[in-house]
Amino acid sequence: MNARSTGQHPARYPGAAAGEPTLDSWQEAPHNRWAFARLGELLPTAAVSRRDPATPAEPVVRLDALATRLPDLEQRLEETCTDAFLVLRGSEVLAEYYRAGFAPDDRHLLMSVSKSLCGTVVGALIDEGRIDPAQPVTEYVPELAGSVYDGPSVLQVLDMQISIDYNEDYVDPASEVQTHDRSAGWRTRRDGDPADTYEFLTTLRGDGGTGEFQYCSANTDVLAWIVERVTGLRYVEALSTYLWAKLDADRDATITVDQTGFGFANGGVSCTARDLARVGRMMLDGGVAPGGRVVSQGWVESVLAGGSREAMTDEGFTSAFPEGSYTRQWWCTGNERGNVSGIGIHGQNLWLDPRTDSVIVKLSSWPDPDTRHWHGLQSGILLDVSRALDAV
């Protein structure tokens, strides 16, 4: 017997309403749990090639190694909407967790952990002498003359020390970050929106101030534009050449692209938890990956040493880490362990623990993008796992 057509497409995931999620709802709960793992089904993406053939996946290592000291770890991971969690100590995967329906070879959206990857590519080009961090941005991208980026140096962009008229309120439809999203194809376009990310960046203004921290996602896309200009490559190709192809990654990463093909460097990368851990491993190994050196030892040391504490103005971060700072697209806790992290909204973390030579990856789908409540729970898990590793 033939099934009668309903005139609707099948639901994208169990329980989803017909047509959901849309461009305007995929970042919201409950849709984000599906979308963060299946972004290529919603948005145009490009592959960040690993170059060599993929290697067979290793079996999953459970949480047993941490169970004695952290018996409630799995419960805490579930309570914080964790999709993937991994602890890499040296070259050994010590513990892993994947929620039901999420596999070790599934990619997950990194959100602003993507910024730390971009900062690493810029570091590689600085090491090569192709970017001078002291030079003004417009030396590389003259199209930004007349914008807020006309005057500040590349290093000030890296460290997010530019005063800019940019509201990073992810739920405010009138905010610049939502206009940024729409220009990049992450939300439904509106009349009058810039045609693409390049054009959006040229519209940004500010008071000309520098030297004080202001978190702004546009800064990372400016860095990606500089990368394109000095290499002659699309950002997605540069990310592959200077980072991903050297990691011995299990899978290609992906990055969302706008209608011009510009990769959304500030938040659009997706990869597996295991491959993200390889980025952290490279950093703790002094910038060296299986495929060769990515960045210099000096670059890594600059990141691990942290940035200007005097410049840091983010009260949410300093309430948890009073000595915290931001440098080269990484968050630096300034705590006694020297923890450094790439952080993304909705619960994405690439956490480095130099004391135990360990990397912790936590990929999540919080219902809220960015609140002290969720960050407090997340930081508590990461710190407790780091301390537990002292005795493992």
Swiss-Prot record:
Catalytic residues (positions): 112
Listed GO biological process terms: nylon catabolic process
Broadest EC class assigned to this enzyme: hydrolase
Q: Which of UniProt's keywords are assigned here?
A: Hydrolase, Nylon degradation, Plasmid
Task: Name a Pfam family for this protein.
Answer: Beta-lactamase
- Additional facts recorded: The EII enzyme is 100 times more active toward the substrate than the EII' enzyme.
Name the chain's protein.
Answer: 6-aminohexanoate-dimer hydrolase
Task: Give the species.
Answer: Paenarthrobacter ureafaciens
Q: What is the lineage of its organism?
A: Bacteria, Bacillati, Actinomycetota, Actinomycetes, Micrococcales
Encoding gene per record? nylB
